[in-house]
């Protein structure tokens, strides 16, 4: 079950996230391993004072590379961090729940997207869920999308 949960978590992380940028549009960014490393490079460029940071939208090699402003790239890297951290935290809470199960029936109730009982939620997951609730979400199943 832990392998199933890990696989779903990794798939969700890699599929990426959406973020609204200064143009008012929602943009999608993938989080393949090379994307995650490149986001770190972008943060270094921001800290060096770069004002135009090149990136291929959605990790695509079929679209032209474009420049993103420092503010937009900061939004992108912040969203990337939140996306990865939330899903890793949620996955770890699911695995704690898996460890606590005593029957096959209980184990079957656990899947990626299930609401983790509060007993198995880390403090970090509780904080993420509370923040999600305050902006209109209601539970993990919405948050893990």
Which positions does each model-derived feature cover?
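A preference for well-ordered globular domain cores
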Residues: 1-145
């Amino acid at each position: 079950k832990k392998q199933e949960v890990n696989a779903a978590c990794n798939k969700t992380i890699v599929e990426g996230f959406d973020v609204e940028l200064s143009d008012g549009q929602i943009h999608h960014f993938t989080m393949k391993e090379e994307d995650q490393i490149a986001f770190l490079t972008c943060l270094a460029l921001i800290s060096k004072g770069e004002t135009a940071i090149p990136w291929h939208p959605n990790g695509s090699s079929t679209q032209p590379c474009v420049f993103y402003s420092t503010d937009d790239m900061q939004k992108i890297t912040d969203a990337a961090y939140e996306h990865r951290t939330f899903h890793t935290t949620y996955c770890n809470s699911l695995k704690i729940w898996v460890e606590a199960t005593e029957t096959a029936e209980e184990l079957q109730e656990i899947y990626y997207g299930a609401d983790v009982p509060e007993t198995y939620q880390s403090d970090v997951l509780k904080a993420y869920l509370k923040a999600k609730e305050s902006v209109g979400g209601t539970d993990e199943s919405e948050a893990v999308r």
